[in-house]
């Protein structure tokens, strides 16, 4: 029997829809050839509507499901990529979960890495002593992105320790400058840190006027703002043995932390802690891998800095002393054209130099491996887990042993006690090992102070005295030899006069140590021996960077300036005067200026004499006053000339003059400061306390600036 009904499956319907546009279906003419399924859809539009709606919903569900899976995968990928960042500027906040554990934050301000080393050593020992607490060590610059975040985070801290180095003339280190400015110069917040308990350890040198200023100021400010001081501020003195100062301070800290971090029923006695000798994982290579060569001096960073210096060629060099001199002073010019480097008058340049070849030869002999040994150092295990906690210095690029000893190893400084323990651990002679351990022990404190510190014995001399100590390369570079640091110089030029050059004025360091060794300054010797581009196709170059300074001329050129800089202390003032000459030539009105310069003898070491006279002749400098210490029957220094010009100096100060001092911090700068105090007291008819306040106000207002070392 025949029937008019047609049996249509769901697949037939779907096929018809997929092969024909919906608009075409709704407008099809009966004359067109249609499949049975299509005819049914056209004749039953209600079915068509229901079916298409169902299909649309199904397609929508599929799209949403695919999108969510894609988004989830992308989020996971982004999270993994974020974790790959080597040095994140902002802390990952997954530690904010309240798990009931007590947290201790360790913050450090470091210039050469010493404060960071102490902070991380403190962290490692504390982790062993207090296993139930969570410790983290953070660079002060990485702790917060801005002032608001500093405040937000400090409000949450309950226990913190600060390791703060004082740099230059009582200044914070580069990575602590932003924190220090916020914490000491901000609005008075009252006692807003009552929740915080803290300790501070400072790193400084007692020979300098502002000994440990940064640590002392931060310690006082914390207490003023309500925080509870756990122990007195530790005053580490690099002029003696800072490690002993650190140890003594820690012995005051542990009893306090015992009360805070140990359980009440914990009556156990802490096991004596012995720090592990740090060691890199070392991989030896048959030959240099060109893909692993050090390209750091091509930089690749937008702004060169201490971690990312830029290669700069030596463009020009000349000796500034006359042949009659028994000393040396080098004028050297770095070519910074097309390097991305720029600077302002008064800035500093940091220069990375290599150890002298004779020093490297001696170091290679004492290490006991071939100079062409090619290797790389790693701060992680083969499976990627970190080695030695948080204390290992950052690895340097793969290179030969000779290059590593030349570029990265400070082998001429006196070894720290931790280095002696590293040598002892790898001394095959038991007597030598015991002797090294004794020197590093509390019992050997006096002998260490005499045999190493006072005698200025270098690491190489100590290794020579203990020939059986042959540490492996991983130990030598991680625990024994400190990293060679950049040398900083006041730039002696102005970009307004020499845009593509950085000028440096450097006195040669050449002196005999108490044990008779001739010590040659690493960077000053390199500069003296440098070969400029104008003299050879094989010329000298160095990785350099610019460090911003607050040593600036007044923004108003009409403000008077007083400059005091004997010897190489003249360097930044040469830049000042170049800038003033440039302004003068452009028609700018200048305020009066006086320069106090000092040297031994006009015929021997009167550096830049012709230039200084020209500055006077052109009006860039109003008056040049020179003190010669070896010409007359009596020695005359810049402070004596200041006294002779006391009335003029006072008049300039009352007119709003800026006063600048550059040079030796331990001697000259102290003498000039005392002389200035006397001038203010006598010329201003003030008592001693008011004169001291006047000078302090000059400093606070930025009118008395010092660039001293």
Swiss-Prot record:
Swiss-Prot/TrEMBL GO biological process terms: sesquiterpene biosynthetic process
The organism's taxonomic lineage, starting at the top: Eukaryota, Viridiplantae, Streptophyta, Embryophyta, Tracheophyta
Record localization: Endoplasmic reticulum membrane
Pfam families found in the cross-reference section: FAD_binding_1, Flavodoxin_1, NAD_binding_1
Known glycosylation sites: 27
UniProt source species: Artemisia annua
Domain of life from the UniProt record: Eukaryota
Biased composition (Basic and acidic residues): 288-297
EC number: 1.6.2.4
Name of the protein: NADPH--cytochrome P450 reductase 2
Biotechnological applications: Artemisinin and derivatives (e.g. artesunate), are antimalarial drugs due to their endoperoxidase properties; they also display multiple pharmacological actions against inflammation,viral infections, and cell and tumor proliferation. Artesunate may be a promising treatment for COVID-19 mediated by the severe acute respiratory syndrome coronavirus 2 (2019-nCoV) (SARS-CoV-2) because of its anti-inflammatory activity, NF-kappaB (nuclear factor kappa B)-coronavirus effect and chloroquine-like endocytosis inhibition mechanism.
Signal peptide residue numbers: none
């Amino acid at each position: 029997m025949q029937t008019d009904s047609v049996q249509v499956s769901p697949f037939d319907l779907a096929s018809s829809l997929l092969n024909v546009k919906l608009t075409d279906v709704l407008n099809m003419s009966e004359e067109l050839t249609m499949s049975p399924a299509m005819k049914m859809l056209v004749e039953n539009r209600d079915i068509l509507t229901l079916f298409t709606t169902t299909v649309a919903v199904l397609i929508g569900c599929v799209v949403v499901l695919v999108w969510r899976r894609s988004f989830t995968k992308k989020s996971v990928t982004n999270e993994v990529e974020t974790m790959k960042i080597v040095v994140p500027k902002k802390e990952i906040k997954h530690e904010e979960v309240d798990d009931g554990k007590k947290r201790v934050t360790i913050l450090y301000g470091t210039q050469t890495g010493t404060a960071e080393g102490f902070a991380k050593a403190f962290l490692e020992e504390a982790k062993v002593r207090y296993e139930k607490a969570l410790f983290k060590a953070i660079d002060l610059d990485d702790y917060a992105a801005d002032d608001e975040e500093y405040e937000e985070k400090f409000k949450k801290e309950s226990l913190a320790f600060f390791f703060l180095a004082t740099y230059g003339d009582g200044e914070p280190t580069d990575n602590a400058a932003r924190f220090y400015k916020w914490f000491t110069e901000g609005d008075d917040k009252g006692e807003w840190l009552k929740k915080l308990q803290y300790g501070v350890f400072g790193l400084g040198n007692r020979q300098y006027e502002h000994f440990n200023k940064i640590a002392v100021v931060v310690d006082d400010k914390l207490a003023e703002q309500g925080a509870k001081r756990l122990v007195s501020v530790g005053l580490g003195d690099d002029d003696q043995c800072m490690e002993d100062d650190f140890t003594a301070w820690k012995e005051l800290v542990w009893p306090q932390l015992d009360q805070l971090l140990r359980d009440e029923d914990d009556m156990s006695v802490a096991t004596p802690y012995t720090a592990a000798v740090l060691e890199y994982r070392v991989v030896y290579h048959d030959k240099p891998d060109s893909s692993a060569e050090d390209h750091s001096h091509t930089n690749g960073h937008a702004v060169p800095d201490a971690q990312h210096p830029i290669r700069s060629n030596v463009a020009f060099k000349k000796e500034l002393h006359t042949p009659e001199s028994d000393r040396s002073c080098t004028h050297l010019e770095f070519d910074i054209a097309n390097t991305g480097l720029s600077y302002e008058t008064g800035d500093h340049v940091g220069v990375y130099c290599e150890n002298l070849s004779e020093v490297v030869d001696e170091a290679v002999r004492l290490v006991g491996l071939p100079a062409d040994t090619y290797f790389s150092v790693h701060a992680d295990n083969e499976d990627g887990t970190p080695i030695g906690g948080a204390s290992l210095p950052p690895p340097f690029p793969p290179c030969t042993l000779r290059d590593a000893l030349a570029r990265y190893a400070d082998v001429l400084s006196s070894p720290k006690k931790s280095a002696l323990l590293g040598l002892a651990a790898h001394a095959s002679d038991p007597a030598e090992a015991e002797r090294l351990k004794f020197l590093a022990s509390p019992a050997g404190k006096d002998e260490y102070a005499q045999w190493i510190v006072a005698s200025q014995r270098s690491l190489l001399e100590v290794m020579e005295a203990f020939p059986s100590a042959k540490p492996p390369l991983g130990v030598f570079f991680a625990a024994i030899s400190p990293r060679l640091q950049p040398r900083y110089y006041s730039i002696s030029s102005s970009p307004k006069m020499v845009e593509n050059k950085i000028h440096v004025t450097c006195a040669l360091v050449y002196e005999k140590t108490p044990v008779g060794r001739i010590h040659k300054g690493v960077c000053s010797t390199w500069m003296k021996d440098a070969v400029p581009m104008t003299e050879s196709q094989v010329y000298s170059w160095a990785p350099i960077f610019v460090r911003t300074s607050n040593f600036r001329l007044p923004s108003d050129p009409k403000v008077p300036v007083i400059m005091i800089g004997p010897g190489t202390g003249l360097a930044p003032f040469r830049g000042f005067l170049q800038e003033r000459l440039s302004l003068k030539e452009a028609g700018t009105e200048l305020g009066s200026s006086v320069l106090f310069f000092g040297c031994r003898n006009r015929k021997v070491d009167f550096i830049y004499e012709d230039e200084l006279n020209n500055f006077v002749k052109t009006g860039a400098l109003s008056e040049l006053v020179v003190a010669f210490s070896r010409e007359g029957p009596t020695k005359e220094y810049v402070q004596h000339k200041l006294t002779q010009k006391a009335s003029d100096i006072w008049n300039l100060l009352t007119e709003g003059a800026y006063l600048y001092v550059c040079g030796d911090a331990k001697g000259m700068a102290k003498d000039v400061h005392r002389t200035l105090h006397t001038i203010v007291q006598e010329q201003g008819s003030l008592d001693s306390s008011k004169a001291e306040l006047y000078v302090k106000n000059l400093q606070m207002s930025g009118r008395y600036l010092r660039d001293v070392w």
